[in-house]
């Protein structure tokens, strides 16, 4: 039976979430990608608490970078989430791509976060 795109994404997401979990020492960097925007959260799964979040919908992000290239926006969100995480003392995370393929905007966010100082 062939799965459609949504079912394939859900299947990958369930498979990844079975293996990837965040702790207090090494929280999970979760990425959600919609058609126009990208969201990133650093989550402690044991406490069920979001420690840091950033998205392309934030007013300061929109005024600074405006509308346009979504891949460039992903790079900026990666840098922003890394800066906020490092400010809270979080250096090591576990990367959760949210069922999406590690390609394009998800990859751009991950590489920017690594360059900005996050380890995963």
From Swiss-Prot:
Residues 1-10 have a biased composition (Basic and acidic residues). One of its GO terms (biological process) is translation. One of its GO terms (cellular component) is cytosolic large ribosomal subunit. It comes from the Bacteria. Residues 11-20 have a biased composition (Basic residues). GO terms for molecular function: 5S rRNA binding; structural constituent of ribosome. Gene3D superfamilies: 3.30.420.100. Residues 1-26 are annotated as: Disordered. Keywords: Ribonucleoprotein, Ribosomal protein, RNA-binding, rRNA-binding. PANTHER family: 39S RIBOSOMAL PROTEIN L18, MITOCHONDRIAL, LARGE RIBOSOMAL SUBUNIT PROTEIN UL18M. Belongs to the universal ribosomal protein uL18 family. This is one of the proteins that bind and probably mediate the attachment of the 5S RNA into the large ribosomal subunit, where it forms part of the central protuberance. Part of the 50S ribosomal subunit; part of the 5S rRNA/L5/L18/L25 subcomplex. Contacts the 5S and 23S rRNAs. This is Large ribosomal subunit protein uL18. It comes from Cyanothece sp. (strain PCC 7425 / ATCC 29141). The gene is rplR.
